[in-house]
Each structure stands twice: as structure tokens, then as C-alpha cells.
A protein has these predicted regions:
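Bacterial N-terminal signal peptides that target proteins for export
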Residues: 1-10
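N-terminal signal peptide c-region/cleavage motif recognized by signal peptidases
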Residues: 17-19
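Sequence context surrounding c-type heme c attachment/ligation sites in exported
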Residues: 25, 29-61, 65-156
């Protein structure tokens, strides 16, 4: 569990420092990398939790708690910073509607943050039914944003 937490903290730190490390890239590319890296980290932590709930991989309470903790830690990263004006162009799946509806997009992200906080809290109980409900609620929060703001294919 400690290794996974350290990995997430290290990755979050690298993500936060990414703008400095890639200052040679144009802003569009830098922000796209920022967003894609962040979302990849979310998926790497949430995906195994979904798989455990669905019975696709063995239930491992210790790992599940670590994934939930790390997912909650990632909610402290300023994801919305990755969407400045002008960064909607290029190779991305972020729909232009994000920039047209920034308040709604921010509200949906706040809903995700709340869902993840609740998931993290419930994960520690070991109650599989409650965990399954919170995983579903977190998935619904992800889907609410994806349905409206994520393109199926890359936009150019």
C-alpha cells in the first residue's frame, strides 16, 4: 500500500511540475499532456476498483483502500488548470464545449471530487455492498463529464 501511495504522490508531483519540465512545448501541447496524464492516473487507480467490484479480478481490500486513498489524493491536484483558453485545439478528446461551459464543467468536476471523497471513506469500512455503491456513484460522476465533454475519437 505504501508503495502505491508513494507512486501516486510522486506522479502527482511530476504532474504538477510538468509545466516547468516541458517549457519547450507550446501551451496547447503542454496542457493536453497535463490533462491526459492526470486522467491516466485516475484510470489507473479507479479501473482496478471497478474490476474488483465486478469480480473481474480478486477482491483485495488492502489494494482497494490504497487505490481509493490515491484517487482521493489526486483530487487535490488542480485539474481545471489544464483547460486554459486556447488549449482546446490540437490532438485531444476534450470537446470545445468545455470552454463554452466552464462553470458546468467545474461543477461536474466538483461532483467527482465529492464522490471520490465518499468512496475513500467507505473503502476503509470493508463493506463490499457500500463500496460497490460508491464505486458506481464515482463512475456516474465520471460519466456525467464524459457524456458531455469527452469526444469518442480524437479531435484535430
Amino acid at each position: 500500500m505504501l508503495r502505491n501511495s508513494l507512486l501516486t504522490v510522486t506522479a502527482a508531483g511530476a504532474l504538477a511540475a510538468a509545466p516547468l519540465a516541458v517549457s519547450h512545448l507550446d501551451d496547447e501541447q503542454m496542457m493536453q499532456s497535463y490533462r491526459q496524464s492526470y486522467l491516466a492516473l485516475l484510470g489507473l487507480n479507479f479501473g482496478p476498483m471497478v474490476a474488483m467490484v465486478k469480480g473481474e479480478i480478486p477482491w483485495d481490500q488492502e489494494r482497494l483502500e490504497a487505490f481509493a486513498d490515491d484517487l482521493d489524493t489526486l483530487m487535490d491536484v488542480d485539474f481545471l488548470r489544464g483547460f486554459p483558453e486556447g488549449s482546446q485545439r490540437g490532438t485531444t478528446r476534450a470537446k470545445p464545449e468545455i470552454w463554452d461551459n466552464k462553470d458546468d464543467f467545474a461543477d461536474k468536476y466538483a461532483d467527482l471530487q465529492k464522490a471520490v471523497a465518499s468512496l475513500d471513506e467507505v473503502a476503509a469500512t470493508g463493506d463490499r455492498d457500500a463500496i460497490a455503491r460508491e464505486v458506481a456513484a464515482t463512475g456516474d460522476a465520471c460519466k456525467a463529464c464524459h457524456d458531455e465533454y469527452k469526444a469518442k475519437d480524437y479531435l484535430y
